[in-house]
Amino acid sequence: MFDAKSFIEESVEDIKKQINGRKTIIALSGGVDSSVAAVLTGKAIGDQLLAVYVDTGLMRKNESNEIWNIFKEQMGLNLKIVEAKDLFLSELAGIDDPEQKRKIIGRIFIEVFEKVAKEQGEEILVQGTIAPDWIESEGQIKTHHNIALPSGMVLEVVEPLRDLYKDEVRKLATELGLPEKIAHRQPFPGPGLAVRILGEITEEKLEICKEANFIVSEEIEKTGLQKELWQYFAAVLDTKATGVKGDIRDYNWVVALRFVKSLDAMTAHTPEIPFDLIKRISKRITSEIPNVTRVVLDVTDKPPATIEFE
């Protein structure tokens, strides 16, 4: 049985020893993993910690504002937001291979942190890596952005959660007093919406993905189903389909819906979702996002599929 209180006590001491008085940056995404890592590190080293949130442009709708309100205004963390959308999108232009996209995001992600670290005199980078991240990477299922570190990286990495699974991290979040919204937030991939946009990432597909995911989250959370689901999201497929808008033929993008249940992300299954809810989500997406003509439902378990599309 996982003892959250004991883990916190031991981790705080371990982090103190690892960091040993050095100035430290944490990669804060607002997900439960990085949030718990931030609080643990803060308990260990206090004001030596600088929480850095990189706005890659690949995040959820309104994410930067929510991060600021929760972590700066409510929790009082020493928080710096780095606007890097243009940098990420320019580097990703023309790239359609999923592994290339992940590696580019990982490289830029670390480079941005290194730049801030040099400016602030930081030496340590804390990451919220958990067990499924490195297990999948070692098994070559997919590369996770927060462990595909470039050679010659200047910062030393500390990963206080690397042996834990998501359910254990959520228990830690509750024990640490994190807001319910963070403690039980659905997992969000490190590379952001990049793994929910198949093929090349364009501004058009990115905006579709943001709006579609916002609609899915809003509708699921209205019903309370988020408490039963591991993840619920939309992906933009790299294909178009014929539709009709008004009396006019339209040839535009296809959005896929995905709902899964899981305990630790190593396996997952597709539950039955009320069909009227699926229809409502589909209708909202096709009516509120002009350049989407079709919505489909992915019912594939993991394995054989992974949870995210890329």
UniProtKB/Swiss-Prot annotation:
Assembly mode: Heterodimer composed of a glutamine amidotransferase subunit (A) and a GMP-binding subunit (B).
The species this protein was found in: Methanococcus vannielii (strain ATCC 35089 / DSM 1224 / JCM 13029 / OCM 148 / SB)
Designated name of the protein: GMP synthase [glutamine-hydrolyzing] subunit B
Keyword Repeat among UniProt keywords: no
A GO term for molecular function: GMP synthase activity
InterPro entries for the chain: GMP_synth_C, GMP_synthase_B, GMPS_ATP_PPase_dom, NAD/GMP_synthase, Rossmann-like_a/b/a_fold
Catalytic activity: XMP + L-glutamine + ATP + H2O = GMP + L-glutamate + AMP + diphosphate + 2 H(+)
Enzyme class: ligase
EC nos: 6.3.5.2
Keyword field contains Metal-binding: no
Pfam families xref list: GMP_synt_C (PF00958), NAD_synthase (PF02540)
Source organism, top-level taxon: Archaea
Matching Gene3D superfamilies: 3.30.300.10, HUPs
Pathway: Purine metabolism; GMP biosynthesis; GMP from XMP (L-Gln route): step 1/1
Domain GMPS ATP-PPase: residue ranges: 2-185
Disulphide bond pairs: none
Keyword set, alphabetical order: ATP-binding, GMP biosynthesis, Ligase, Nucleotide-binding, Purine biosynthesis
Sites where the protein binds ATP: S29, G30, G31, V32, D33, S34, S35
Record-linked HAMAP family: GMP_synthase_B
